[in-house]
Amino acid sequence: MYLTKEIKEEIFAKHGEKTNTGKAEAQIALFTFRISHLTEHLKKNRHDYNTERSLVLLVGKRRSLLDYLKKKEINRYREIIKELGIRK
């Protein structure tokens, strides 16, 4: 499995708190990790349409979290965009 417990803990520790995994930044960082992994998979497997669909759904979930963060805390939004290298 590409997303081990250690990787999750590392992401949560870096982008939030180790115990607060529901923080918007932590969830966005986790979605970004999964999106990058699925993107690499789709480069090798062009006809994997189920993975392509799940990638689109993940991008939508991340976008909605980013919109929420932008509406509530613009400074935290700008930090996470810059830190993860996400386009606006």
Swiss-Prot record:
<protein>
    <recommendedName>
        <fullName>Small ribosomal subunit protein uS15</fullName>
    </recommendedName>
</protein>
<dbReference type="Pfam" id="PF00312">
    <property type="entry name" value="Ribosomal_S15"/>
</dbReference>
<keyword id="KW-0699">rRNA-binding</keyword>
<dbReference type="InterPro" id="IPR009068">
    <property type="entry name" value="uS15_NS1_RNA-bd_sf"/>
</dbReference>
<keyword id="KW-0687">Ribonucleoprotein</keyword>
<dbReference type="GO" id="GO:0022627">
    <property type="term" value="C:cytosolic small ribosomal subunit"/>
</dbReference>
<keyword id="KW-0689">Ribosomal protein</keyword>
<dbReference type="GO" id="GO:0019843">
    <property type="term" value="F:rRNA binding"/>
</dbReference>
<comment type="subunit">
    <text>Part of the 30S ribosomal subunit. Forms a bridge to the 50S subunit in the 70S ribosome, contacting the 23S rRNA.</text>
</comment>
<comment type="function">
    <text>One of the primary rRNA binding proteins, it binds directly to 16S rRNA where it helps nucleate assembly of the platform of the 30S subunit by binding and bridging several RNA helices of the 16S rRNA.</text>
</comment>
<dbReference type="GO" id="GO:0003735">
    <property type="term" value="F:structural constituent of ribosome"/>
</dbReference>
<comment type="similarity">
    <text>Belongs to the universal ribosomal protein uS15 family.</text>
</comment>
<dbReference type="InterPro" id="IPR000589">
    <property type="entry name" value="Ribosomal_uS15"/>
</dbReference>
<comment type="function">
    <text>Forms an intersubunit bridge (bridge B4) with the 23S rRNA of the 50S subunit in the ribosome.</text>
</comment>
<dbReference type="InterPro" id="IPR005290">
    <property type="entry name" value="Ribosomal_uS15_bac-type"/>
</dbReference>
<dbReference type="GO" id="GO:0006412">
    <property type="term" value="P:translation"/>
</dbReference>
<keyword id="KW-0694">RNA-binding</keyword>
